Amino acid sequence: MNLRLKRARELAGYAVQLTKDEGLPTMLKRGAGFVKRRCFGKKARYLPAKKVLEAQRAEMAGKTAADCGLPTISVLTPLYNTPEKYLREFLDSFVNQTAPNGQLCLADASDAQHGDVQRIVEEYQAKNQRIVYKKIENKGIAANTNAAAQLAAGEYLALADHDDILAPHAMYTMGKAVLQLRQRGEPDGFLYSDEALFSKSIRRPIAAHFKPDYAPDYLLCCNYICHLAVFKKALWDAVGGERPECDGSQDHDLFLRLLERTGGAAHVPQVLYYWRVHAGSTSGGTEAKPYVAAAAKKALADHLARTGRTGTVEDGLFPSTYRVKWDIVGDPKVSILIPNKDHIDDLEKCLHSLWAKTSWDNFEVIVIENNSTDPETFAYYQKAQQCYDGLRVVTYPKKGFNFSGINNFGRKYATGDYLLLLNNDVEVRNADWLTELLRQCAHPGGAAICGAELFYPDETLQHAGVITGLGGYAGHSHKYKKAGGSGYMFRAATVQDLSAVTGACLLVKTSVWDEMGGLDEAFAVAFNDVDFCLRVREAGYRIVWTPYAQLTHYESKSRGGDEKDPVKARRFASEQQRLYDVHGKANILDDPYYNPNLTRDREDFSESDDLRSLKEGRVSVRWR
């Protein structure tokens, strides 16, 4: 009864925090989903079907690590006073793997009062020669992990905590993923999977962490990779293993150093690791282990120093998150392009906020007049150009509305190092908004494009990046979420690598704009920003979004969609088809910075109703 009461209190605390972060509707929706899964849903929803696991075991029957055809993966696990229940569950999860290509390397630093740890391990060793063990002096988590690595015989290493659980198909799936990469001639130095949180049983998981493909800017904000990471032992040896001075964030530090050498990673969208939530675990938050933040900031600062980039590492918006305030190189000029047709009240609000609130002063504004009919509009233009130093109004010569054509025309008058596409119904919220956009681009190795955090007037999110494939074409990350929330895996509160951002506020290097030939004028109204971003990414550039540049977008939530007007509906369908034709429908529906196990029907990062790929144990991997 006490355990049930404790669990109820934990859930109540989670519900209160979720309500504070994301609002009552989100909490109720998630709560309903939890009750549905708990009471009516299938158990073990992230595990492959029983027949799939049986087929894997049949494939590997009678084989050893030497002849199973899969690379050997040595799992490094430091032990320290591990409770018997947790230890046995962890050891069972290794012993019951569907493939024999794993080796378990245990370095035991338990004190004299916990001799049962050694006894239990020796009991398992007697039945399984793939478990190796060494009693060591306790020198901290990093040094103890390094001691475990000295026992490793595998081509690959993986890290696992002593109180967690490996999914039964973890070694099989990672081994097969390596073979897939090799068959395609792609790098195979670093792989990572999705994971889930659990408390009592992995058959009743709390939630999953469905991760994006390799996202280097996101990784600088939090260790989203976490478990299960698998990497070549040769790389581990090259970087010298884990660093004791980063104890608490030793894995984050290790991943940064490994990825400096690989230049990328492969993501396997299968839940291969179960992270136990209990008092004192890092899965319960850094409040349980406050030294984690200091170690993480050191790891990040050292990473910047090694890679020759300069900036200041600070705490992020939430515990376990961080931010790099990149040093801006030089004094880049920004040309702000604002298309406008009448609506001078909106335009004046926008312009006033630019000059009244923007701390970055090296900018010019080019208003692109597009077929206005109200005489007051033209009178306002004259007044505004006298009032705002650096404002110029130019007239688009063609009839009709073509967002791409209008901005391409405005580019001809721009003199900045960067272009900023900005809607006329946007208002600045924080003084450093333009500085923060530039921070992400105007430094060595910076992104080519950066998008901003846009809010509706009612303080809900309008834009935290674009996810392609939502609704069949594209949608906005965390749309309608309450302002100030962390979002899914902190993705509404940390710098994000993305496939696209909205053209309502989009900063791009002028040189990249010119290289791409600007916006494609075949996309007159819809998807011009998405198409442009995809072309930029396909050319090898990065696109990011920052929560530190905030503006209000007065676009109406209730504005009718194009499908309500037959002419607009046909135009929308045509532009959607062109998006498919240019970039491939399969690519549009498979955003690498999303996850195939998340829904395509909503913009809230909720789980897909169809987790077929998990139930089938489908082995897919993508290097990025």
PLM region spans:
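Conserved donor NDP-sugar-binding/catalytic core segment of glycosyltransferases
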Residues: 169-205, 426-473
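Short beta-strand-to-loop acidic/aromatic patch adjacent to the donor-nucleotide binding site
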Residues: 154-165, 416-429
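Active-site donor/metal-binding and catalytic loop motifs
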Residues: 269-286, 316-322, 455, 521, ...
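Nucleotide-sugar donor-binding/catalytic module of glycosyltransferases
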Residues: 36-288, 302
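C-terminal, non-catalytic tails of nucleotide-sugar-dependent glycosyltransferases
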Residues: 2, 6, 10-68, 289-331, ...
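Short, acidic, metal-binding catalytic loop of nucleotide-sugar glycosyltransferases
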Residues: 92-101, 352-362
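A short, conserved alpha-helix in the catalytic core of glycosyltransferases
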Residues: 235, 245-271, 300, 433-437, ...
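Glycine-rich, basic loop-to-helix element that forms the pyrophosphate-binding segment
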Residues: 136-152, 396-414
